[in-house]
Swiss-Prot record:
Belongs to the KdsB family. This is 3-deoxy-manno-octulosonate cytidylyltransferase. One of its GO terms (cellular component) is cytosol. It comes from Burkholderia mallei (strain ATCC 23344). Activates KDO (a required 8-carbon sugar) for incorporation into bacterial lipopolysaccharide in Gram-negative bacteria. Keywords: Cytoplasm, Lipopolysaccharide biosynthesis, Nucleotidyltransferase, Transferase. GO terms for biological process: CMP-keto-3-deoxy-D-manno-octulosonic acid biosynthetic process; lipopolysaccharide biosynthetic process. It is an enzyme of class 2 (transferase). The gene is kdsB. It comes from the Bacteria.
Length: 263
């Protein structure tokens, strides 16, 4: 599958996961997880797929399956910082679109990867593009692990938060603080999907930006870009993506899926 839009996909992969050690190398149907992710990025039509890791074992495994890999430093505080190092090392042109495909999402939809890259290309005033999908249940809106995003009339992010935003005042206040009794939201609420496309020129700038107070409070790195005046275009998709792999239970679920596909 090819794409009319040239973009680079980078898959950050680090072995030092506290909940699931050696996660990028976990076996999924005979291949390491990080390779499965790289395959999805290739299906999305990326002009180039790179795996970025601070572990030689990961680089070796990726290269054995025909993908390019870049050795990066071990001290990066975020995946965006790791992408910035890759962009600097490889000398990407300023306008190169670089998509960060999380290394623990082997079921990510290639179409969504392609759509986010195209969305950034269609919004020249934005440095970043990402994705979101609508949520409708109060328990989702009030879950701090579900990051919400509020959009302006042009689909550009106004704010990301773990809090329930926008706050449906007349619907929520009569029931506050009993979250279990909360009705469904009265206006659209969007849950953020952690897939990003960047312009390479922004990636070169990102490591020089000071951490923002709102970023530290929410623990959301995209708020740093917004704090410093960058715009983030949001591609809304109607469907929630497949869940990533964070725990041993997640891994067992996805391994079972790959086993069933092999039959």
């Amino acid at each position: 599958m090819t794409s009319p839009l040239p973009f680079v996909a980078v898959v950050p992969a680090r072995l030092a996961s506290t909940r699931l050690p050696n996660k990028p190398l976990a076996d999924l149907g005979g291949k390491p997880m990080v390779v499965r992710v790289a395959e999805r990025a290739r299906e999305a039509g990326a002009q180039q797929v790179l795996v970025a890791s601070d572990a030689q074992r990961v680089l070796d495994a990726v290269r054995e399956h025909g993908f390019d890999a870049v050795l990066t430093r071990a001290d990066h505080p975020s995946g965006t910082d790791r992408l910035a190092e890759v962009a600097a090392k490889l000398g990407f042109d300023d306008d190169t679109i670089v998509v960060n495909v999380q290394g623990d999402e082997p079921l990510i939809d290639p179409q969504l990867v392609r759509d986010v890259a195209s969305h950034l290309a269609a919004h020249p005033s934005c440095a970043i593009a990402t994705a979101a999908h609508p949520i409708h249940e109060a328990h989702e809106v009030f879950n701090p692990n579900y990051v919400k995003v509020v959009l302006d009339a042009h689909g550009v992010a106004l704010y990301f938060s773990r809090a329930p935003i926008p706050w449906s005042r007349d619907a929520y206040l009569p029931h506050w603080p009993n979250v279990a009794a909360m009705p469904a939201p009265t206006c659209p609420v969007y849950r953020h999907i952690g897939l990003y496309a960047y312009r390479a020129r922004f990636l070169r700038t990102y490591p020089t930006l000071a951490q923002a107070p709102i970023e530290a409070a929410e623990q959301l790195e995209q708020l740093r870009a917004m704090w410093h005046g960058e715009r983030i275009a949001v591609r809304v998709t109607e469907h929630a993506p497949e869940a990533g792999i964070d725990t041993p239970a997640d891994l067992e679920r996805v391994q079972a899926l790959f086993r069933s596909r092999a039959k």
